[in-house]
Amino acid sequence: MCGIICFIQYGGQKIDLVSCLNCLDKLNNRGPDAQSYQVIELGDITIFLGFTRLAIMDTSEAGLQPFKDNNSNYSICNGEIYNYKNLAEKFNIEMQSQCDCEILLPLFNLRGFEGLLSDLDAEFATVIVDKYNSKLYAARDKYGVRPLYYGYNCEKGLIGFASELKALHSVMEYVEQVKPNQYVTIDLSFRPSIPFDLQNFVKLFQFTNYHEYYQSHKSLIDYHEPNIEQLQTSINHLLTEAVRKRLYADRQIGFLLSGGLDSSLIVAIATRLLGPTNIVCFSVGFEGSPDVAAAREVVKFLGIKNHHIVPFSVDIGLNAINDVIKTIETYDITTIRASTPQFIMAKYIQENTDIRVLLSGEGSDEIHGSYKYMRSAPNSQEFHKETIRLLEELYLFDNKRTDRTMAGNGLEVRVPFLDFNYVDFIMNIDPNLLMYKSDYIEKKIIRDAFKGYLPENILYRPKEAFSDAVSSKEINWYRSIQKITEEIYTDEKLQNSNYKFNKPEIKEALYYRDIFNSHYGGRDHIIPHYWLPRFQQNNVLDPSATILPI
């Protein structure tokens, strides 16, 4: 991970360099290895580009950003560009370093910004200053693996972009996430009056869709009769390649192993590619949790010797929740429940090992439609529409959790299940083949594609929510939180809470909201709604799958 930040100061005012650097410092967690910045003058506009580095590819100073080209254009990027060598060869680009992000400026000069976006096989968030044409561009990868926020301060004539909310919160009136399927263009030749008004904002920010999410109206007639064996071969090949391309780094790579199907498959594939002696796994949970037991079985089956089990308990979790919410920048219930043990695990990795790059199984449940509530989807069309919605909103929930818990501890996470080629293939499979049926388990076609990779009882282990599975039979993590919040809040206090937007309906939600508000007051809109299951007859207020009547 790295941290990026950009400020644009209008009106001929001198940019507040001290304030810019203070905001940049708030991203040091994402990039603890180095910090750098560039101030760019463009007439009466001043641009600040800042970068905090976690050195992964080319750990020398040659990989330190911002990058600058002969046209005095600049780029900053938080990302991993997996096809940068292929692009350099294809377009005859001479690289000055081995840093993958160096490819952006020469590629931009050859292909333009939309062409650049279409060429990248990457997880990224980037800002490019085209000084020659007086344009600024900002975008993130199409599934939102890497974060990017924008904001503005009308009174000061200031616009900003940053990797995290915390870097903009103190200086911006308004902050919002850049949507993963959009890029932002700012015309630097336009000179708005200060303070900004709404008309200025509309002229300044141009949002363009560069990726359309998958069709939501597909029906059975859109699909040819499938050859199941060929489908499984393709699934195996594409996921293997997704893992393979994410194993390249100039730092040692580790693996987050929950013990569930998704992370276990990633570890099993990597073991076949690298050999068991080169695999280091990390698991977290209560002693006696089903996840920890399953993870132990996986590493034993694969012959992996280096397996760290990070202890977790109610007290450890409760003591960390304030830091967790400040780090992950949300008040969503299920995100915080799952983030807490993951944050504890990330902290352990950072403090006790030299590993700084990790592979994880995030994104699988969304694209495969394997959440428990998806069993209630009335038909294949509604099932498919819901997987699209989940994919579109990943940046609000699970991607935010995984990015922040890892980056908050100076680590980088890579997610093979969100590989572009793999997602494209899965989203074009007949949804009937992914839907849960009474006679077989969810994701059966995926499981069958990897027979022999894992013990049968792990390969066909039913899904459990991460925050549930880290618990033990005796002690449940989220129910322990709810017990505490029952003691903190009365029914009357819950009913009369001052939060109008996304009003907390349970005491646990109010507890999280109060903590969030203490750090990011006035930013309630940063998530449009809570993550909750669909297709339920009754109004569901708790996201845990354990309470669903299925």
Curated annotation (Swiss-Prot):
Molecular function terms from GO: asparagine synthase (glutamine-hydrolyzing) activity; ATP binding
Keyword Ligase attributed: yes
Residues annotated for ATP binding in this entry: L256, V284, S360, G361
Enzyme kind, highest EC tier: ligase
Documented EC number(s): 6.3.5.4
InterPro entries linked: Asn_synth_AEB, Asn_synthase, Asn_Synthetase, AsnB_N, GATase_2_dom, Ntn_hydrolases_N, Rossmann-like_a/b/a_fold
Active-site residues, Swiss-Prot/TrEMBL: C2 (for gatase activity)
Residues holding L-glutamine: R53, L54, A55, I56, M57, N78, G79, E80, D100
GO annotation terms (biological process): L-asparagine biosynthetic process
Keyword annotations: Amino-acid biosynthesis, Asparagine biosynthesis, ATP-binding, Glutamine amidotransferase, Ligase, Nucleotide-binding
Pathway(s) where this gene product acts: Amino-acid biosynthesis; L-asparagine biosynthesis; L-asparagine from L-aspartate (L-Gln route): step 1/1
Domain Asparagine synthetase stretches: 213-530
Secretion signal, residue range per the UniProt entry: none
Highest taxon of source: Viruses
Name the UniProt record assigns to this protein: Probable asparagine synthetase [glutamine-hydrolyzing]
